[in-house]
Regions:
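Active-site nucleotide/adenylate-binding loops and adjacent lid/helix of ATP-dependent enzymes
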Residues: 28-114
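ATP-dependent carboxylate activation and anion-phosphoryl transfer catalytic cores
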Residues: 42-45, 169-227
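Short beta-strand or tight-loop elements
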Residues: 70, 111, 122-124, 189-192
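Short small-residue beta-strand/loop micro-motif enriched in glycine and branched aliphatics
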Residues: 22-23, 81-83, 162-163, 215-220
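A short, GP-enriched loop/loop-strand-helix hinge that lies immediately N-terminal to
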Residues: 1-32, 47-50
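Short, flexible, mixed-charge acidic loops at enzyme active sites
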Residues: 6-10, 150-157, 210
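Phosphate-binding site of ATP-dependent enzymes
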Residues: 94-170, 174-177, 198-204
């Protein structure tokens, strides 16, 4: 669960002058650190969920000043594919939440958690491609959940218990523009996937996959069956 582990392959390829697809070691490392890229994008005008870090040395009162009596989602700041996520990771933050947060630290085998405001809205994914120096955002694909758990936890991810639908409404243009701008800001090479939650017509960028799945159960695979 160390930061930067997915940068080893591009770093190795660069060292030996081997051609590869995807972003370089720096960008891949950046895209694995949810807190850092979230704050960077926020400073550059991208709408993101409010986000803070929590460790066993954190002061709960600082979190309460931001999120008291609000629902939050708690993630491992470095992991992907919803690793370690369960229904325990979305809850209302209150005075009694300290023990729950400490339990999540242990259960998720990490020393630092990302605490974000929970955006209760539809979830979608946008693939951005880079070609000859320009970025192109493809059609957004909505995640259709099959259970009452309205986010992808580990079990949902492992069993592919969801479906897809291409978003056709006018919000697609804002999603595409936002994903494209984020890719440009981050210096993405070749491709990346940008994940959003939409609430009251506002898309919140909450996750990025620098090496997204393209296998049959992925939104990317589904999207290319629709063209």
């Amino acid at each position: 669960r160390a930061n930067g582990k997915k940068s080893l392959i591009p770093a190795f390829c660069d060292l030996l002058n081997i051609k590869y697809t995807g972003s370089d070691a720096f960008v891949i490392s950046l895209l694995r650190n949810k807190y850092v890229y979230t704050k960077f994008l926020e400073e550059n005008g991208i709408t993101v969920p409010r986000s803070e870090l929590f460790s066993d040395k954190s002061d709960l009162h600082l979190l309460l000043s931001q999120y008291k009596d609000q629902y939050v989602i708690v993630k491992n700041r470095y992991e992907s594919a919803s690793i370690g996520m369960t229904d325990k990771n979305v809850f209302r933050l209150c005075q009694n939440s300290l023990q729950h947060l400490n339990n999540l630290l242990k259960e998720m085998c990490t020393d630092s958690l990302l605490v974000q405001e929970y955006i209760d809205g539809i979830e979608c994914e946008v693939l951005v491609l880079q070609y000859k120096g320009k970025y192109y955002a493809l059609d957004p694909v909505q995640i259709l959940f099959k259970t009452n758990l309205n986010f992808i936890d580990t079990d949902t991810s492992n069993t592919y218990n969801y479906e897809f639908k291409v978003i056709e409404s006018s919000i697609k243009f804002l999603l595409q523009a936002t994903a494209q701008k984020a890719a440009e800001l981050l210096g993405v090479k070749d491709y990346a996937r940008f994940d959003f939650r939409i609430k009251k017509g506002v898309p919140y960028l909450f996750d990025i996959a620098g090496t997204p799945y393209t296998i049959y159960h992925s939104s990317i695979s589904y999207l290319f069956t629709q063209y």
